[in-house]
């Protein structure tokens, strides 16, 4: 690879809550065109600020205030000021996420000597925990509404969304109700975007008309490569997304060079230990042993999800049209009343609030199944 890379932009992606510990997920764009997801805590940012002051005393204004170029990281009192009267750790966490994003952007906008220093490059480089294929049990990921940019609005309305929802297709026709008690009819081969997966087997999906509904997971399967909602070919999403557990330097022309934490698309797998991958605008071979399913990146981008016993991303065939006459998939047992909401965070429950349920069942729907959150 030509020269060391350095971060060029940082964007706040999500608030990750693990029991009582809050960490902040960021999407980091690098000088080589790649992007990675990292998680950092508030204390880690405070330690970064301290290290920068020791490493760059002039830029920190320790000798003369007029020479200061390092941005300030507001303290706890300044952070809580815009949130007076508001209740909840989630609101404060989202405010911190916005504040840390602003601080990170200002750091990268300082002098090149500081912005490209090993201190900042190392801080935003993926760490072993960032490369884990799954978040710790009990983790909650809270996404801020995209349009809520100002800090003063960070504790406002929230929404469940995906940065890039995964598109799955329906195996057979199925009728249920959406989150507003309207008929939700899915046809065979229809593409649905998965917004939220729940262990009960009922997933929150969205159709082309922007209707959202709880839908049985056995009725869904991965769409064929290049057959998204728009129906056009897309090399950028032609395979599952994996993460490089460590850096790799190519030794042949048909191989790829990737840094640690690089997110690659697997175009073709092989039992010989080398997979054909796409990284940026280049395609080449990578050792399969270096690749692992994404954890946080998959959750935030909605891609790379592999279910069942297929964690290694092995190629799977797609059913022929004649298989549409096969017996309908088994519908999972609906959870007990309130089971899904009890497993969701407060943000999710608020996003799923709806009008009072109407009486009667929708017309033209055979064996209509209410979504699990509407049972009384």
Swiss-Prot record:
Constitutively potentiates the superoxide-generating activity of NOX1 and NOX3 and is required for the biogenesis of otoconia/otolith, which are crystalline structures of the inner ear involved in the perception of gravity. Isoform 3 is more potent than isoform 1 in activating NOX3. Together with NOXA1, may also substitute to NCF1/p47phox and NCF2/p67phox in supporting the phagocyte NOX2/gp91phox superoxide-generating activity. Changing residue 332 to A: Loss of intramolecular interaction. One of its GO terms (biological process) is regulation of hydrogen peroxide metabolic process. Residues 328-337 are annotated as: Proline-rich region. Interacts with NOX1, NOXA1, CYBA/p22phox and NCF2/p67phox. Interacts with SH3PXD2A and SH3PXD2B. Expressed in testis, small and large intestines, liver, kidney and pancreas. Isoform 3 is mainly expressed in colon. Isoform 1 is preferentially expressed in testis. Changing residue 334 to A: Loss of intramolecular interaction. Changing residue 40 to Q: Loss of ability to activate NOX1 associated with loss of lipid-binding and plasma membrane localization. It comes from Homo sapiens. Residues 163-225, 237-296 form the SH3 domain. Residues 302-376 are annotated as: Disordered. Keywords: Cell membrane, Lipid-binding, Membrane, Repeat, SH3 domain. GO terms for molecular function: enzyme binding; phosphatidylinositol binding; phospholipid binding; superoxide-generating NADPH oxidase activator activity. Residues 326-335 have a biased composition (Pro residues). This is NADPH oxidase organizer 1. The PX domain mediates lipid-binding, localization to the plasma membrane and is required for NOX1 activation. The SH3 domains mediate interaction with CYBA/p22phox. Also mediates intramolecular interaction with the proline-rich region. Residues 1-131 form the PX domain. GO terms for cellular component: cytoplasm; NADPH oxidase complex; plasma membrane. PANTHER family: NADPH OXIDASE ORGANIZER 1, SH3 MULTIPLE DOMAIN.
């Amino acid at each position: 690879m030509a020269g060391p890379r350095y971060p060029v932009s940082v964007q706040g992606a999500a608030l990750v809550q693990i029991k009582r510990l809050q960490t902040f997920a960021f999407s980091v764009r690098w000088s080589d065109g790649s992007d990675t997801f990292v998680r950092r805590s508030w204390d880690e940012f405070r330690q970064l600020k301290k290290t920068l002051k020791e490493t760059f005393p002039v830029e920190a204004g320790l000798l003369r205030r007029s020479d200061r170029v390092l941005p300030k990281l507001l303290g706890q009192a300044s952070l809580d000021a815009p949130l007076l009267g508001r209740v909840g750790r989630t609101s404060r966490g989202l405010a911190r996420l916005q504040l840390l994003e602003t601080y990170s952007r200002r750091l990268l906008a300082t002098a090149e000597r500081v912005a490209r220093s090993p201190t900042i490059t190392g801080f935003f480089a993926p760490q072993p925990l960032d490369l884990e294929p799954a978040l710790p049990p009990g983790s909650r990921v809270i996404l801020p509404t995209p349009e809520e940019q100002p800090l003063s609005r960070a504790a406002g309305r929230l929404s469940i969304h995906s940065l890039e929802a995964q598109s799955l297709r329906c195996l057979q026709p199925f009728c249920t109700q959406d989150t507003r008690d309207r008929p939700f009819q899915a046809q065979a081969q229809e593409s649905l975007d998965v917004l939220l997966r729940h262990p009960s087997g009922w997933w929150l999906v969205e159709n082309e008309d922007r209707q959202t509904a709880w839908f049985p997971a056995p009725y869904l399967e991965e769409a064929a490569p290049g057959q998204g909602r728009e129906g056009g070919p897309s090399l950028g999403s032609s395979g599952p997304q994996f993460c490089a557990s460590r850096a790799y330097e190519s030794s042949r022309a048909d191989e790829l060079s990737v840094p640690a934490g690089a997110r690659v698309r697997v175009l073709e797998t092989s039992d010989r230990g080398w997979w054909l991958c796409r990284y940026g605008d280049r395609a080449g071979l990578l050792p399969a042993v270096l690749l692992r399913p994404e954890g946080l990146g998959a959750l935030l981008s909605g891609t790379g999800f592999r279910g069942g016993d297929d964690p290694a991303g092995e190629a799977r065939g797609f059913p022929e049209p004649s298989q549409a006459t096969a017996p309908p998939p088994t519908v999972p047992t609906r959870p007990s009343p309130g089971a899904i909401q009890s497993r969701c965070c407060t943000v999710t429950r608020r996003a799923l609030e709806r009008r009072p349920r109407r009486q009667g069942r929708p017309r033209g729907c055979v064996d209509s199944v209410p979504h699990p959150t509407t049972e009384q």
